[in-house]
Regions:
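N-proximal low-complexity "stem/linker" segments adjacent to membrane-targeting elements
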Residues: 1-23
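Short beta-strand/loop segment that forms part of the nucleotide-sugar
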Residues: 8, 20-21, 29-37
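Acidic helix N-cap motif at the loop->helix transition within catalytic regions
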Residues: 15-19, 40-49
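Conserved donor nucleotide-binding strand/loop of the catalytic core
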Residues: 29-32, 43-71
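A conserved acidic beta->alpha catalytic loop
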Residues: 35-43, 85
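Acceptor/aglycone-binding surface of glycosyltransferases and processive sugar-polymer synthases
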Residues: 57-59, 63-71, 89-168, 195-206, ...
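Short beta-strand-to-loop acidic/aromatic patch adjacent to the donor-nucleotide binding site
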Residues: 75-86
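Catalytic donor-sugar/metal-binding loop of nucleotide-sugar-dependent glycosyltransferases
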Residues: 142, 164-166, 176-193
């Protein structure tokens, strides 16, 4: 059995994290919740639900992911999903399948290909994602449909990508670098539902604009970099 670690960045998600952890299927051999500076009981709830909790005081989605990766050095495959219950953790089996069957190095769960519940994402967030994906496809020659956080990658591929982005450009950096370095990338449909609690990013137009600007900059920088 392959060693599969699930990394879940979390910031003030005490209402959702217990449900997320409860829904993770047994294919995961280790689950790590990265507390990214929560001021609520996220860490306590996660521990009570059976997860290992590590702390990353430096704010940022990418920073939390990097801390989670460092915490699972023995993992052969690392999966990422959100802590807000917007993803369906049970679909981890489908996300992992192309890697486990030897057909992919990186699998991205595409919300565009799956079923999106009403009010799962505000319109400005959907349009912003389409803009970012469109730019990536144009500059890199990919045929992606999403930059969603629910994904899985082999440890070897992840090491080769030398991930650096500290914030929300993390997923875009991974996909651009994977494409430029010739990794086998596949998308699988994943469903999406309204998150529990308020969003720290896409809940406001300003938040989405800030995140979107960072993602666009990440795409352009890595797409035009000689090193990839």
């Amino acid at each position: 059995m392959r060693r599969v670690a699930v990394v879940i960045p979390a910031l003030d998600e005490e209402e959702a994290i217990g449900l997320v952890l409860k829904e993770i299927p047994p294919v995961a051999t280790e689950v790590v919740v990265v507390d990214n500076g929560s001021r609520d009981r996220t860490a306590e709830v996660a521990r009570a639900a059976g997860a290992r909790v590590v702390v990353e005081p430096r704010r940022g989605y990418g920073q939390a992911c990097l801390r989670g990766i460092a915490a699972v050095p023995e993992a052969e495959i690392i999966a990422f999903l959100d802590a807000d219950h917007s993803d369906y953790p049970a679909q981890l089996v489908a996300v992992l399948e192309p890697i486990l069957s030897g057909d992919a190095d990186l699998v991205v769960g595409s919300r565009a290909l799956g079923r999106r519940a009403r009010r799962a994402q505000p319109l400005h967030a959907i349009l912003g994602t389409r803009l970012c994906v469109g730019l990536m496809n144009l500059l890199v020659g990919t045929r992606a449909t999403d930059l969603g956080p629910f994904r899985a990658i082999t440890a070897a591929a992840l090491k080769a990508l030398d991930m650096r982005d500290p914030d929300f450009g993390w997923t875009a950096e991974m996909q651009v670098k994977a494409a430029r370095r010739g990794l086998r990338v596949k998308e699988v449909p994943v469903d999406y539902r309204p998150r529990i609690g308020s969003s720290k990013v896409s809940g406001t137009v300003l938040g989405s604009l800030r995140a979107g600007a960072g993602i666009l900059g990440t795409i352009a920088r890595h797409a035009c970099s000689r090193a990839g």
